[in-house]
Amino acid sequence: MSFNLKKYGIDVVELYRNASVPALYELALTKEKGTTISDAGALCVYSGEKTGRSPKDKRIVRNPASEYNIDWGDINIALDEHVFHINRERAIDYLNTRSRIYVVDAFAGWDENYRLKVRIICTRAYHALFMQNMLIMPSAEELENFGEPDYVIYNGGGFPANRHTSHMTSKTSIDLHLESKEIVILGTEYAGEMKKGVFSVMNYLM
């Protein structure tokens, strides 16, 4: 059976899972406006309005299972379950409007006994390329036996959050749910939010 994302409610025509670097370069150059290659061979892209992280727009779902392990305040800002699901559905709806989706299945951490299996679902080739550099890519055999991921990132960053929804301060929202093991990104195409999301999980577990 071919790989698909239907279990997440995502069904698109083109799906690229752990695409090669040359393939991602080609897709970025041919499908993403303004993308070019520098004289050093680096892929140059536009990340949109956001050119850096948005720490004030990061939220963590407040849940009885983990709330006493988190120092809530100006850095760790709480989000309720209902709003998380609104944002998750918004991201999935956006992903379903795209003609192509990129998936990166990779590991966070070197030690096989402790590493996390992470699945990134995104709409831009440069996002996939970035996360292939940030995480540890599986061998062909490891990918074949990857199974279910420990965490899933839904990167719907090309679509804004509804700033009138409770707990939202702007059209950008990066939401972490430690219990459902999901991260939702809206309103920013800055790739560093995916990396920081994974690092936040790793720091919490350590």
Task: Kindly give the residue locations of the regions a language model identified.
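A noncatalytic interaction/capping subdomain that flanks phosphate/NTP-handling catalytic cores
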Residues: 1-205
